[in-house]
């Protein structure tokens, strides 16, 4: 289930809750790149926001 989406230019990240775990799914140019598990929803949102705002993450 997608909880939130972060977008900036050609990058986006979805914060999801899958099987009780929070996961951030990273996209660039609408193509899936990678994902990362987080301990809390807030941590997942912070990771997602960092990804879309900073070019050097991942």
What are these regions (language model features)?
Residues 1-25:
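Short N-terminal "domain-start" leader segments
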